[in-house]
Amino acid sequence: MKVRSFIMRLKDTGLTAQELKDMVNKYMVETYERYDFIAERAEGMYLYDEEGNAYLDFYGGVAVNSCGNRNPKVIAAIKDQLDDIMHTFNYPYTIPQALLAKKICDTIGMDKIFYQNSGTEANECMIKMARKYGVEKYGPEHYHIVTAINGFHGRTYGALSATGQPDNACQLGFKPMLPGFSYAEYNNLEDFKSKVTDNTIAIMIEPVQGEGGVHPATQEFMKGLREFCDENDMLLLIDEVQTGWCRTGAVMSYMNYGIKPDIVSMAKGLGG
C-alpha cells in the first residue's frame, strides 16, 4: 500500500480552494502577488490545478526545472540518493559531492567549486571572494565592485546591494545598502569604465538580464569587459544563476562570448 506522509491533493484537506488561499494569506508573509489558481501537481511543461486544468509552465520553477516538471530521470536519481543519505554535513567525504565537483569543473573548465545552498548565496560568495582578493593583494580599501543597472543578483544583503535597482522595492526599506558598489549602464562598456576607481577590484555581470524582459549582453560588451579586467588586474564575476546549464544554447552562457570568468555563480538549473 502506498502511504503519503503529507496531504498532496486539495480534496484530502477538507478545504475549498478559497479557504486554502485564505489560509495562505493569513499565515504567510505576503511578498508575492499570486496567480489565482492552486498548482496541485505538475507534469512535463504543464502545471495542473485541483480541477485538472492545465497551465503552460513558462516559469519552470523560475528557471529551476530545466528538465521539465517531474522528469523521470531526475525523480529516480533523487529517490536513489534518499535511500542512502538524505542530508549530511561537510566534514565527512561523500561520493556524490566528489563526483559532481569533478563533473562541473571538467565541464566548464574551472579549477574548484564551492557548494552553497542557493543562487543568492553563490553570489554572496563571489562578492566575498573578490573583496578578499582585493584586500589581501592591494590593501583594505580595495573592495569596490561595479555592477549593471537593472541587474539582479539576489535578495540577501550583499547580493541585494550588488543589484543595480536602488529605486526598486527590492531595496527600498533596507537601506543603507552594503557600501562598495557602483552601477553602470548595461551593454555600455565606456560607462562601466567610467565607474571604475583606484579601489575597484571586480566587475559583476549577468550575460542576460532577466529583470523587465530578456536583455542579452552584446559580444563587444562581454569581450570588452574581459579585456578591461585583464588590463587592470580586476576580476570578472559572471552571475549564471538563471542563464547557466544549457539555458542559452551553451552549457554556460559566457561560453557564447568566447570568454572565461574568474569566478562564476550557478544554481537553479543545476538542480533540475
Predicted regions and their residues:
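Conserved N-terminal phosphate-binding loop of PLP-dependent enzymes in the Aspartate aminotransferase
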Residues: 3-272
